Structures are given as C-alpha cells and as structure tokens.
Design a protein with these regions (language model features):
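Acceptor/aglycone-binding surface of glycosyltransferases and processive sugar-polymer synthases
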Residues: 73-89, 94, 103-181, 202-214, ...
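Amphipathic alpha-helical interaction elements
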Residues: 35, 171-175, 226-229
Length: 327
C-alpha cells in the first residue's frame, strides 16, 4: 500500500486477461498521453484471472511507478463484470475505460479530456471502421439491430466500452446495483451529456483476441436481457401468432402431402419449428432477466478480489459503493 494522496484528475482503467504481450506497452503509452494532458493521473489494471505471466509483469510495473495500481480477481468474472468493477474502483474526477490491446487508441485521451472539460459528462469512442472478419461484423450488426429494435433506450452504432466518464456518472451507475452491468447501455440510459469521437479501430498490437463469436453473442444476449424490458411482453403476443400459424400448418399438411408430395410437408414443419425456436429464444431472454433479478436480490459483488497492489491506504479494500445493500 502507498500513503493516502490527493484525488487524481484522471483514472485510466484497463481490464486484462492474458495480455502479457501488451500490458507494459499500453501502460507506457497511456502514461505518456496522460502526463501530457492531465493534471494528475492513475492507471488501474484489473486482471481477470490471467495465466500467461501478465500478473508478474503487472507487479513489476507497480514497483516501477506508484501511479500504476493493480486489482487481481480471484477468478475470471467475464467481459461485463470485471471491467465495470474496475471503473467503480477508480477515484479520478474523470475515468477512462479502455482495452489493453491498443484497439482503443491511447492517442485519443487528450481529445476525451478536451470534450470533458468542455462540458460533456460522457465521451464515447465511436468505431468508424475496423479490420474484422465479415462474420464478426455480421454478429455485431445483428446484436446492434436487436438492441435498437427491442432495447429501452437509443443505441449508438459503433460505440464500445472505450470512453471517458465523469465522476458523477460513475457514482450514479455504481448505485444501480446491476448484477450483469451492460455499462455502455447504462450510460446511454442514464441521460448524461454525451459527446462522440469517431475513430478508425486498429488491429490488436499483439496476442490473440479473447472476443470470439461465442463471447460476443453471450455479451449481446446479456446486454439485451438487461436493457430490453419490453421483451417481457413480446412472447405473449408472439405465442398467439405462432400457435395460430402452427394450427394452420397442421391442418394444411395432409392436403399438401396428397397434392404436392412430402416436400411441402417438410417445409411446413421446418417453418413451424423455426417459429417455435424464435419463441424459445425470447423465453430464454426472459429467463435471463429473471436470473438477473435473482442475482440482484442476493447482493453479490461484481468481483471478489484476490489482491490489490499500489493502492493508497484509504483505498485498501473494495470501495463501499460497489457492495450496495438495498433497504
């Protein structure tokens, strides 16, 4: 632990999972940018159970620079809980969240701070272009489409978790006690003054991406379940139409078999099963919402820490605001 000190103007939170090839370089780049644009700063690295030597490098970075702080989770808590928990542990008057792989350019830190000093409470990086596979882009497009259609607030295409958040924003969202915090959605829903900075997203500097198709799909479903309350009613209406259509198909199937052969029967059954699959999808999302309500009632913390390094003595443990108890 280090002695207590004044609140920094800027906190930069960098979640990591097996980023041994990037973590030292990203800290150096962020330090250079923050030193040139902020009155004072801290860097918080939150490690989500790395096994590739990332933690050893983090310890060395902390030994060399007291402004670098580390939170070591006792296990992997996923792409939503760990990064958000890191943001809640920051003490800066402005808090930036960014990836460790250089796909969120540190060079934008100065522009983020200028927008913030100009009155914006939230400054989001908006992905203008990205070198990604067609399949990955398609999955993201579908995810944004679902959120735009069924979500409870506007969707900002291309916006990621890369952004700056005012102290008031962080404290307000921490008080929401979300068990699976879809932070980028919460930011838009909260209605704080928002500014966007378009940027071209580069490729990873080194290492392999941890965001595969399955991970992105899981992330999108969690975000949709947590931000689309209208889905609670949708299956009621959908089930009525599906039931009527299924009844019509069952009545028409024997006729189709006699007149046109078994092909039409197979097509009818395929359509029927497809519609029921859609119904099950929405029911699954509702089940996810019910699970979130159950998790919220348990008051489980987002993350259980194994260790924290280089934090001042007055920040020796989890901040009280992250373990919110409802009356």
């Amino acid at each position: 632990m280090t002695p207590a000190h004044d609140t920094p103007e800027l906190s930069v939170v960098i979640p990591c999972f097996n980023e041994a090839q990037n973590v030292a370089a990203i800290c150096a780049a962020v330090t250079a940018e923050a030193t040139g644009h902020a009155e004072s700063h801290e860097i918080i690295l939150i490690d989500n159970g790395s096994t590739d030597g990332t933690r050893t490098i983090m310890r060395n970075l902390c030994a060399a620079d007291p402004r670098i702080r580390v939170i070591l989770n006792n296990r992997n808590y996923g792409q939503m809980r760990s990064p958000t928990y890191g943001l809640y542990q920051a003490e800066g008057r402005a808090v930036i969240g960014m990836c460790a792989d250089f796909q969120d350019p540190p060079a934008l830190i100065g522009e983020f701070l200028r927008k913030w000093r100009g009155g914006a409470q939230v400054v989001l990086g908006q992905r203008r272009s990205e070198k990604a596979s067609p399949l990955l882009r398609a999955v993201r497009h579908i995810g944004y489409g679902f959120l735009a259609r069924f979500g409870d607030y506007p969707v900002i295409p291309g916006a990621t978790g890369f952004g700056l958040f005012d102290r008031e924003v962080v404290d307000t969202l921490a008080a929401w006690n979300e068990p699976e915090p879809f932070f980028r959605g919460m930011v838009v829903e909260s209605g704080f003054r928002l500014a966007l900075i378009p940027f071209d997203r580069p490729e990873r500097a080194a290492g392999e991406s941890k965001n595969g198709i399955a991970a992105l799909a899981s992330f999108a479903l969690s975000g949709l379940a947590g931000s689309a309350k209208s889905l609670l009613r949708l299956p009621l209406f959908l089930s009525l139409y599906v039931g009527l259509l299924a009844l019509a198909l069952l009545i028409a199937a024997p006729v189709a078999l006699i007149v046109d052969g078994p092909v039409w029967v197979l097509l009818a059954l395929a359509l029927c099963f497809g519609l029921f699959a859609m119904l099950l999808l929405f029911l699954g999302l509702i089940g996810e919402q019910v699970r979130m309500l159950a998790e919220r009632s348990r008051n489980v913390p987002l993350v259980i820490e194994q260790e924290r390094i280089n934090f001042p003595v007055d920040r020796a443990g989890p901040a009280a605001r992250t373990l919110i108890r409802r009356p």
